């Protein structure tokens, strides 16, 4: 097996709050192989986006990385000074942010925003060379050269999202984190955006971490899926296993909540509400909503352990 391009070990993130500490990410561990498509799924507030920001060392006060380590190709990101970490962003690991509407600078043309990314990383190019590079990047994501001269408000939602992909991949990163890249887009545009992301990934031979809660989209795109609940990874498995034989009760509940065109019957919701991250229940955080919870689940927090080709944090897996 090839060496992981990204290695996350027991990463924890907390936020200070007047009513108590908010444990947004709790000892998350996983590895990402070169060229792999890895998904992170879970309800809103489960810690997915916070985990992505922690991997990029972009957590701002009152948040902090409490513990754990992130490595890229053997280098610990915690050991890098701010200048080297800034250089690694875009060039080594890049983020396609959630909500392109709020991610692009409204007063700068798209071409200028790409050129600024080049300049920020020390790439000095003649005007003509920069223009050719920008045109090539836009073509890579299926946008015409004229987009370089346009402002964000002149683009549709799908075009904005593809412009964000162009900016994120302008320095050919080895890892692309796509945080809900299809949110607020209709299904036709969603497909176009995901096809664009897949094409760019293949051309760059990059690995992708896709964050979202659309299990159908995950099933079509990722190779392996990590399911998060209350800041913890509760299951990691090949996507086919997640869909056909989920092992964690929360994963099973997520799959059961999906409407099906085949059965056309009633689908089951997940009872109760996700817990407050500053007031987590003892033991397994899912036990108040779990149909098979026992006394042990209320007392002991299950650890992520190997079960065949999967990893599951459940006492009964």
Question: For each of these PLM feature ranges, what is it?
Answer:
Residues 2-5, 14-27, 58-64, 81-85, ...:
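A short, flexible loop at the N-terminus of ABC-type nucleotide-binding domains that lies
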Residues 4, 236-317:
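Short catalytic/signature loops enriched in Gly
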Residues 43, 57, 177, 181, ...:
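P-loop NTP-binding/switch modules centered on Walker-like glycine-rich loops
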Residues 64-76:
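Conserved ABC transporter NBD signature motif
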Residues 76, 128-146, 255:
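Conserved ABC ATPase "signature" region
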Residues 151-155, 159:
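Conserved ABC ATPase signature
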Residues 170-174:
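A short, proline-enriched helix->beta-strand linker immediately N-terminal to the Walker B motif
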